[in-house]
Regions:
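Membrane-interfacial helix-loop segments of redox and metal-homeostasis proteins
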Residues: 2-182
């Protein structure tokens, strides 16, 4: 049982490491677009947009570094929980104010999808998953190489699954348009 919990912790750490690195890379590659996305949320004063657009990707990378270092993994996952909660609250605030966002700023794949319930559910699930990961980090014990590989593979597969679901969600509107013309 303890080894299964350790494998689950590794999978969660692998998932958030990959997901946050992907999100940070997206933000760093096109900082102007990310700054525009932050402006679209209408939560920050104009003077804070550029610094936030520059700082957030590095915060995500720092969290990844904390997650992958065993001694700081729980701290990294708790910081991840905080970051995911902030992102969730920002989306909720925007939706409650009836502001339509075309891009949540998360990672580029969902750029064609208007931010809505899907994004709220996804981020709520990420908040819960990061709490579980932080909790499981306390149960981590010595594990075989096979267990480490299994955890990393499960985390990678989960990352690909999430990115695929993002792609399907963003293409749903496009597919509906194609199907309605047949």
């Amino acid at each position: 049982m303890a080894e299964a919990l350790t494998v689950a912790a590794i999978a969660i750490k692998a998932f958030f490491s990959a997901y946050l690195l992907f999100a940070a890379a997206h933000k760093l590659v096109d900082q102007a677009r990310f700054e525009q996305t932050l402006e679209d949320y209408q939560l920050l004063p104009p003077w804070a947009l550029a610094p936030a657009a520059k700082l957030l990707p590095y915060i995500e990378v720092l969290i990844v570094l904390l997650i992958v270092w065993p001694a700081t993994a729980a701290t990294g996952l708790l910081l991840c929980t905080g970051l995911m909660t902030v992102y969730l609250l920002a989306m909720m605030s925007t939706l409650l104010r009836h502001i339509q966002l075309q891009d949540c700023g998360c990672g580029g794949i969902g750029a064609q999808a208007t931010v809505g319930r899907w994004h709220l559910m996804r981020n709520a699930a990420f908040v819960l998953l990061s709490v579980v990961g932080a909790t499981l980090s306390g149960f981590t014990q010595s594990i075989s190489l096979a267990g480490v590989i299994t955890g990393a593979l499960v985390g990678g597969i989960f990352t690909l699954l999430c990115l695929s679901l993002e792609g399907l969600h963003s293409n749903d509107r496009i597919l509906q348009g194609i199907l309605s013309h047949e």
